[in-house]
Amino acid sequence: MDSISSPSTSSSASSTPKLISEKCLVCFQPSHGNHFGVDSCRACAAFFRRVFVTHKQQFPCREGDNKCTPDEWGRWSCKRCRSDKCFALGMKPDNIQRDRDRFIFSDNFRDDRKRKTSESIVPLSVERFVGKQLVTTYTSTGSGKNIEYITFFDLTPIIKDADYILKRIPKLEKSVKVKSSLEQLAFGLQEVRKEQLFESVPELRKIGKMETWDNWVKGMRRAGEWIMHFEEFRQLEQEEKMVILKCMWHLFIRLERISMTAEMRRMKLCDDKEFIYGTEQRINYDTLEIDRDWFSEATDREVRSFIGPLPRWFCETIIDALMELRPSDVELSFMLCNLCFHLTGQKLGGRIQEITDRLQDVLANDLHKYYLAKDKYSRYSYRLTKLLSLNRQYKNDLEIRRQGIFLANTLNIFRVKLSHPEMFQFSC
């Protein structure tokens, strides 16, 4: 009886379960559980996954002394010191429990993963890139006129229009103002899509110079109006806002159109070979005619050999993945901002990269709260990983398309001059 009521020290030590700390060891806020081997909150766990598992980036210390700490609310302003803290406490990427999401056990998961991996392989040769044997007549394309360019675009009107938009504060109802920045962006996405036709969308059979210019003008307006729903972005200096918008606008309109195409295909409002090119236009891959006279003297066959098949140019693999994932407007807004801000910061660096990193942190925290508000016990790592993997897939596709454009420019195939070429950093 005494032995039962007074167990030995050794047996007690071996049978006592390990208690979970009430405080997150990284930010000292309430802990959610043991993540990556350390007792932490879900926000810090999501930060570790996002930075070191997904992006695997290295960041400089904001203060320069590697001694930054969280504020009284547990918020870190320095990614470097926060990540160092995670590692110092013993967080490791190999502690990720990848078998906890029920989605992993779907019948098609492994086959889908293999397919996505094979599709992301960069072509090893020019022939493999264009998908056919290259012709050898590029040295004598078109009329042979030795001119620098065929068409010149003065983008000043578009920039002036954007400058005006960036000075306007969108009207938000009180019910929207109290929402998070990410939810306000989702509301902004709904606003810029109000002009979208969903039924009986007219088919655009030919894309020429005027159609291209019109697409740029409307695209810049929609990108500017959308991003101005981001409160932290509105607080930036006008010059900083313009620099960021000029770099990300074209990327935004491509991704937004890709997601709209996925949504309309899922609703059976357009065919598998159709792409929603504009709010009032759709194109068909089989019947679309490209007017080349304004940008090249090459033949249609030669131009298409560089840009590749239209389904690849319009990112069919990402459209299919979005149809399967069915992201909400909040998730889609996060995905758009994550890719736009990441590529913009990576391209421009310096002060702009610091700004885009800070903006991404704001939205990442908002996404975390959004998922918890839907279900505080949900494991949202699957959906977040899928969203970010789509962004990585887009960057891979972007690099492949840019290889074709680079080769075409080397051979002087495309002859268009822009007054502000920096506006097409990610135009492919």
UniProtKB/Swiss-Prot annotation:
Pfam families with a match to the protein in the record: Hormone_recep, zf-C4
Listed InterPro entries: C.elegans_Orphan_NR, HNF4-like_DBD, NHR-like_dom_sf, Nucl_hrmn_rcpt_lig-bd, Znf_hrmn_rcpt, Znf_NHR/GATA
UniProt domain NR LBD: residue ranges: 181-427
UniProt entry keywords in alphabetical sequence: DNA-binding, Metal-binding, Nucleus, Receptor, Transcription, Transcription regulation, Zinc, Zinc-finger
DNA-binding region: 21-98
SUPFAM superfamilies: Glucocorticoid receptor-like (DNA-binding domain), Nuclear receptor ligand-binding domain
Compartments in which it is found: Nucleus
Zinc-finger ranges (NR C4-type): 24-44, 61-86
Main location: nucleus
Top-rank lineage group of the source organism: Eukaryota
Gene3D superfamilies: Erythroid Transcription Factor GATA-1, subunit A (3.30.50.10), Retinoid X Receptor (1.10.565.10)
One GO CC annotation: nucleus
PANTHER family in alphabetical order: NUCLEAR HORMONE RECEPTOR FAMILY, NUCLEAR HORMONE RECEPTOR FAMILY-RELATED
Protein role: Orphan nuclear receptor.
Entry similarity comment: Belongs to the nuclear hormone receptor family.
Protein's name in the database: Nuclear hormone receptor family member nhr-44
Species of origin: Caenorhabditis elegans
Species lineage: Eukaryota, Metazoa, Ecdysozoa, Nematoda, Chromadorea
